[in-house]
Amino acid sequence: MKIRLSITIILLSYTVATVAGQQCGRQGGGRTCPGNICCSQYGYCGTTADYCSPTNNCQSNCWGSGPSGPGESASNVRATYHFYNPAQNNWDLRAVSAYCSTWDADKPYAWRSKYGWTAFCGPAGPRGQASCGKCLRVKNTRTNAAVTVRIVDQCSNGGLDLDVAMFNQIDTDGFGYQQGHLIVDYQFVDCGNELIGQPDSRNMLVSAIDRV
C-alpha cells in the first residue's frame, strides 16, 4: 500500500512539473494550458500569482478573466495614443507587433479593418488573450465624442492606448493632445462579427463617431 501511494505521488509530481514546463501563449504558438491552467507573461503554465495575476501580464486563463460579454464598463479611465497606423500597414497585426497577432493576424481583412485599433489594460474586463478581438465603445468624458474600437494589443497605463486616429476622433476640442491623454468611459459592446463576409463588408465604416 505504501509503495503504491509513493508511486502515485511521484506520478502526480511529474504531471504537475510537466504542465508547468509547457510553453503557451505567444511563446507557444498561441496554445493554452491544459485544464484551464494559467499562462504566464513568459509563456509557461502554472497556478500561482506569478502565472495567473493580470497585474503580472498573465496571457490566458487568468484570474478574474472569465467570459466577458457586452456590458462590462469602467469610467474615468486614462487613454493615451499609439501610432499603429493600421491603414498604412494594410491592417496587418504582425506588421505592428500587436500582442493579439498570435491569435488574430489571420482573421479576414474585413474583420481586421472593421474598427480602429486599441491596446487594452483597463480596470474592468478580460486581460491578455481573453481580451483580444473584443470591441469597446469609448467616450471622451470632456466632450462626449465616442468611437468603437477593437482590442488588438496590451498596454501598461491602466486604461487604453488608442490608435492615434481613434484618439483624434474623440479629442474634438484638442485638450487630450495638449495634456497627452484623455479621460474616457468605456463599455464592452458586440462587435457584430456575424456581418463579416457579407457583400460590401469591406466598405463598412472603420469606426463610427457621434456625440451622445
From Swiss-Prot:
PANTHER family, from UniProt? HEVEIN-LIKE PREPROPROTEIN, WOUND-INDUCED PROTEIN WIN2
**GO cellular component terms given for this protein:** secretory vesicle; vacuole
Where is this gene product found?
Vacuole
Which InterPro entries does this UniProt record tie to the protein? Barwin_CS, Barwin_dom, Chitin-bd_1, Chitin-binding_1_CS, Endochitinase-like_sf, PR4, RlpA-like_sf
According to its UniProt entry, the function of this protein is described as:
Fungal growth inhibitors. Neither CB-HEL nor CD-HEL have chitinase activity, but both have antimicrobial activities. CD-HEL has RNase, but no DNase activity.
Q: Which residues form the Barwin domain?
A: 72-193
Species name for this entry? Arabidopsis thaliana
> Recorded E.C. number(s)?
3.1.-.-
Q: A biological process (GO) annotation for this entry?
A: response to ethylene
User: What turns on expression?
Assistant: Up-regulated by ethylene, methyl jasmonate, wounding and virus infection. Weakly induced by salicylic acid and 2,6-dichlorisonicotinic acid.
The molecular function terms of the Gene Ontology recorded here are: chitin binding; RNA nuclease activity
> Keywords on this record?
Antimicrobial, Chitin-binding, Disulfide bond, Fungicide, Hydrolase, Nuclease, Pathogenesis-related protein, Plant defense, Signal, Vacuole
Q: What's this protein's name?
A: Hevein-like preproprotein
Tell me the domain comment: The C-terminal vacuolar sorting signal (VSS) (194-212) is required for vacuolar localization.
Q: Name one Pfam family in it.
A: Chitin_bind_1
Domain called Chitin-binding type-1: residue spans: 22-64
Family matches, as Gene3D superfamilies = Endochitinase-like (3.30.60.10), RlpA-like domain (2.40.40.10)
SS bond partners: C24-C39, C33-C45, C38-C52, C58-C62, C100-C132, C121-C155, C135-C191
Entry superkingdom? Eukaryota
Q: Where is the signal peptide?
A: 1-21
Q: How does it assemble?
A: CB-HEL interacts strongly with a fungal fruiting body lectin.
